[in-house]
Curated annotation (Swiss-Prot):
Species of origin: Chlamydia trachomatis serovar D (strain ATCC VR-885 / DSM 19411 / UW-3/Cx)
Enzyme Commission number(s): 4.98.1.1
InterPro entries, sorted: Ferrochelatase (IPR001015), Ferrochelatase_AS (IPR019772), Ferrochelatase_C (IPR033644), Ferrochelatase_N (IPR033659)
GO CC field: cytoplasm
Amino-acid positions noted as binding Fe cation in the UniProt annotation, renumbered to this chain: H184, E259
Top-level taxon of origin: Bacteria
Purpose of the protein: Catalyzes the ferrous insertion into protoporphyrin IX.
Gene from which the chain derives: hemH
Enzyme class, first EC level, given as a word: lyase
BP GO annotations: heme biosynthetic process
PROSITE patterns assigned: FERROCHELATASE
The protein's name: Ferrochelatase
Places the protein is found: Cytoplasm
Gene3D superfamilies in the record: 3.40.50.1400
């Protein structure tokens, strides 16, 4: 008997969970470690989380007060469970209010556990953080992990068809489009530590792009230090093309949340509109029936990692 652990980023369901969400995220040393001395890390980033909460709350107000990522992940878990004919337990990494229920469900599970982080490309800061969480909180339950699927044929074909369907629904010809494939950024220091994220993103981009005209860019920088480039904002500012449409494809996100629904729409789309382009943002694949089928195929065919130490931030 196999139990599947479907792990996603998590997000506040209501405005009341914004502070706890930000504290869980910003005090995670896999995310913000290395910026300041370790003894100052938790108190400083807890303070920053509280200070940033009102600003972030205004962004979530644009989404109705909370993130849709919770419900999308829950729905995907239910549908994937039906597809796999197995138990699928959802996990929301930075929604601490849900952690006890997840840990209890895993504790009561029988047989082996396979972790499925919903991130196409592996990084210490996200998938590595999820793995570390369970090593710390559930050490008695060994979990094998599917750590990346960015070049898996099922993911590539699912995304390519999703893009075509979205454009066809708006009667937009692919030939009229320039494609900006946007993925979450990462500090360069992580790459120097051996993080494979940048290489995996590039390989995934090349597989997805095919014959399409476009380029990759990195969004969502925060904090100090040099991050992967080019940034999505820089590409939007410098872009020159004769194509009528700029199509933004957030291919590193399988679930819509604040970085697709607010950041792209409010920071990047206006730049392109001011330059006279028509702009289309491709929604995430979320819990679509095609993605459920593709994800099930990925789960059935992907290798599982059991040697976990190399997967963690050094």
């Amino acid at each position: 008997m196999v139990t599947y652990l479907l792990a996603n980023f998590g997000g506040p369901r209501t405005s009341q969970e914004i502070v706890s969400f930000l504290q869980a995220l910003l005090t995670d040393r896999d995310v913000t470690g290395g910026m300041i001395p370790s003894m100052l890390h938790r108190p400083l980033f807890s303070y920053i989380a509280k200070r940033r909460a009102p600003h972030v709350a205004r962004q979530y107000a644009y989404l109705g007060g909370g993130s849709p990522i919770f419900q999308d992940t829950e729905r995907l878990a239910q549908n994937l469970s039906q597809e796999l004919q197995a138990s699928v337990i959802p996990f929301h990494r930075y929604l601490p209010e849900t952690h006890r229920e997840t840990l209890q469900a895993l504790q009561e599970s029988q047989g082996s556990i396979v972790g499925i982080p919903l991130f196409p490309h592996y990084t210490f800061a996200v998938t590595g953080s999820i793995i570390r969480f369970f090593l710390q909180h559930l050490p008695e339950k060994p979990i094998s992990w599917i750590t990346q699927f960015g070049v898996h044929p099922e993911f590539v074909s699912c995304m390519q068809q999703h893009i075509r369907d979205c454009l066809a629904a708006q009667q937009i010809a692919v030939e009229d489009c320039y494609f900006l494939f946007s993925v979450h950024g990462l500090p360069q220091r992580h790459i120097r530590l051996g993080d494979p994220y940048a290489q995996q993103c590039q390989a995934s981009f090349e597989a997805l792009r095919g014959e399409l005209e476009g380029k990759i860019a990195f969004q969502s920088k925060f904090g100090i230090g040099k991050w992967l480039d080019p940034s999505t904002q820089e590409v939007c500012q410098s872009l020159r093309t004769k194509k009528r449409y700029i199509v933004i494809v957030p291919f590193g996100f399988v679930s819509d949340h604040i970085e697709t629904l607010h950041e792209i729409d409010h920071l990047y789309v206006p730049i392109l509109l001011q330059k006279g382009y028509r702009v289309v943002r491709i929604p995430a694949i979320n819990a679509s029936s095609r993605w459920v089928s593709s994800l099930a195929a990925i789960v059935r065919s992907s290798p599982q990692e059991t040697s976990l130490e190399p997967l963690l931030m050094p």
